[in-house]
Amino acid sequence: MLKMHPNINKYEGVPVTDRIVLAYSGGLDTSVAIGWIGEATGAEVIAVAVDVGQGGESLETVRQRALGCGAVEAYVADARDEFANEYCMPTLKANALYQGHYPLVSAISRPVIVKHLVKAAREFGATTVAHGCTGKGNDQVRFEVGIQTLGPDLKCIAPVRDLALTRDKAIEYAERNNLPIETTKKNPYSIDQNVWGRAVETGYLEDIWNAPTKDIYDYTATPEFPPAPDEAVISFRAGVPVALDGVLLSPLQVIQELNRRAGAQGVGRIDVVEDRLVGIKSREIYEAPGAMTLITAHKHLEDVTIEREQARFKATVSQRWAELVYDGQWFSPLKRSLDVFIDDTQKYVSGDIRVVLHAGVASVNGRRTDTGLYDFNLATYDTGDTFDQSQARGFIELWGLSAKTATTRDERVAASGENA
């Protein structure tokens, strides 16, 4: 019999006959949450673990731990290809960087986890979904808004937030009940990772003057001492990477290989203070070698293939898209509408981009496409160019006519002393 912490309170409104599905990571907090939830509600707990390329332990190891911690069932899903195809690729097409920096590493993994949580709830007859988020972060919103959208009839609970269950209490509970989980406090950071990148926060980093120490990095090598430059050719079809150096690969494989190659060069390190959805600013360290390399290459191919006015408007759409996804609105009507526009812009984003990876930078030095708008004969300054320069004078006169007319008006009003 698991020993209940004396400070734990019962959830109201969750009948003891209910089954509850729990978003399970295999870590301390969610392992302990299995017992906490059972004690607080009397319900059976089904642990749901979703592999989005976070690495580490096998799904079977995670499944066995969940069962060892008291779950009656353990639903595990290898969602790596699904995550790459349906979540990372739309993010790439949008060139999505929240506040110009963050490639939405954690934000885009939550919707796929939500999808499997709701699927598991239906499969096992659960009426409630639980997650291990605190009340201070963005993920609580992402999980609960997503669950409300995909499963409006499902209830949501968050034991760490709702019952004020601290890490010290979690360690005490795990040790007292001999749960099969490591309980040391050796890692002071909060870490979330998947194939699109890695996020590190809290601890020493909360003082925003402190420089990150080398020990917090895992996906990237120190860029100050790089190996020889690594040149890669990334091939795209309709905005999606389909090959690397001429070898056909799936999106997942492209991301994984660029994580390895760009990571070895220290590409993709981001140190930023960002605005959280809950109204506070937070210092975050990100590593996204594959994601940042792909976004860089993709943007350069767009520069060649997308018409100017469409490209300008897409930049605005991409910013709003990133904000929606960061704010937990992956399944919202507006985000779906923006997806339609973004997909339309990608019709001609096909071709090859040559990228040099070196010393923390992914720099583009070559572009090749059959669907581009770059016309050598129009662009060249050499003899034989097809650009008719005689049309420039009239174009300039008309282009500046509005400003010229306004200036003439301003000077006339100023000279007469009239009020505008």
Curated annotation (Swiss-Prot):
Database matches in InterPro entries: Arginosuc_syn_C (IPR048268), Arginosuc_syn_N (IPR048267), Arginosuc_synth (IPR001518), Arginosuc_synth_CS (IPR018223), Arginosuc_synth_type_1_subfam (IPR023434), AS_cat/multimer_dom_body (IPR024074), Rossmann-like_a/b/a_fold (IPR014729)
Gene3D superfamilies: Argininosuccinate synthetase, chain A, domain 2 (3.90.1260.10), HUPs (3.40.50.620), Single helix bin (1.20.5.470)
PROSITE patterns: ARGININOSUCCIN_SYN_1, ARGININOSUCCIN_SYN_2
Any single Pfam family the record assigns to this protein: Arginosuc_synth
Subunit structure: Homotetramer.
Primary localisation category: cytoplasm
EC number: 6.3.4.5
GO biological process, one term: L-arginine biosynthetic process
Reaction(s) catalysed by this chain's protein: L-citrulline + L-aspartate + ATP = 2-(N(omega)-L-arginino)succinate + AMP + diphosphate + H(+)
HAMAP family in the record: Arg_succ_synth_type1
GO cellular component, one term: cytoplasm
Name assigned to this protein: Argininosuccinate synthase
Binding site for L-citrulline: 102, 138, 142, 190, 274, 286
Keywords: Amino-acid biosynthesis, Arginine biosynthesis, ATP-binding, Cytoplasm, Ligase, Nucleotide-binding
Subcellular location: Cytoplasm
Binding positions for ATP per the UniProt entry: 23-31, 132
Annotated pathway: Amino-acid biosynthesis; L-arginine biosynthesis; L-arginine from L-ornithine and carbamoyl phosphate: step 2/3
GO molecular function: argininosuccinate synthase activity; ATP binding
Family (UniProt): Belongs to the argininosuccinate synthase family. Type 1 subfamily.
CDD domains named among the record's database cross-references: ASS (cd01999)
Gene expressing this chain: argG
Binding site for L-aspartate: 134, 138-139
